[in-house]
Amino acid sequence: MALIAGPTASGKSALAVALAKALGNGTVVNADASQVYADLAILSARPTDDEMQGVPHRLFGHVDGSQAHNAARWADEAQGVIAQAHAAGRVPILVGGTGLYLRTLLYGIAPVPEIDPHIREAVRALPVAQAHAALAEADPAAAARLGPADTTRVARALEVVRSTGRTLASWQQAREGGIADRVALAPLVLLPPRDWLRDRCDVRLVEMFDGGAIDEVEALLARGLDPDLPVMRAIGVPQIAAFLDGTASRDEALAAAQAATRQYAKRQFTWFRHQPPASWPRHIESLSIDIIDNLAIKLRETVLTR
């Protein structure tokens, strides 16, 4: 199984298709949290039919926006798709930038029990400093690792230890359901120059705005979905919604979406630089057509020798 990971706009999709064609029997499997949604074809940069070039693509646009997809559900789906590809004599090529999805598929998920809703509500109501102080008392190691400003992770660690009596780290050591030890993996992480990546993000947002993203969000808003659903919080949706309701100009909405995309790409870049195993190859150059073809050839050889 091949795996191509990296931040948004780094060229993963084009490389995945090139690899699939070089192999002759590749199937591209989506590992991006936004690209699962049917409602976000444009804003998620889901590959078009032309970009797919006849290569089979799986787990793209198969989830309705009214549903809240998650890593555990995606990993279950991905395991099924991977098994189907292998049974058909094809090579699955995982491609995406959602690190949590990839980590859950490969290494499993921590079997943390459901959190007591009263504990969750109490934890989420704590002021930032107080929450971090409480975590320092209940789980010193987590508090030392997480800064007070990392409010989401602080709250998660605190609610887990309060609700279960065990630290989140101890639960994570008991991960179950991963496939890393059952597949021969050929990974590649794309970490192109930051300036090149930022420019790509900005240009792509312009193309999205000019290519139907506004109509896409207008249709999404017309559904009257819960604003807390992931599809409603996807990058570009709130910004375009502000333009549509008159609280922002088109240029302001575009600039805000570009800024949000750059920030997201920066977080992804940092995650993929540090979190995957050191043995995973990193490609640190920008991607051109020639480089994509060369990478596909090299990755093909890696796949075939695993």
Swiss-Prot record:
The record marks 98, 120 as: Interaction with substrate tRNA. Belongs to the IPP transferase family. Keywords: ATP-binding, Magnesium, Nucleotide-binding, Transferase, tRNA processing. Signal peptide: none annotated. Coiled coil: none annotated. This is tRNA dimethylallyltransferase. ATP binds at residues 6-13. Monomer. The gene is miaA. It comes from the Bacteria. Its EC number is 2.5.1.75. Its cofactor is Mg(2+). Substrate binds at residues 8-13.
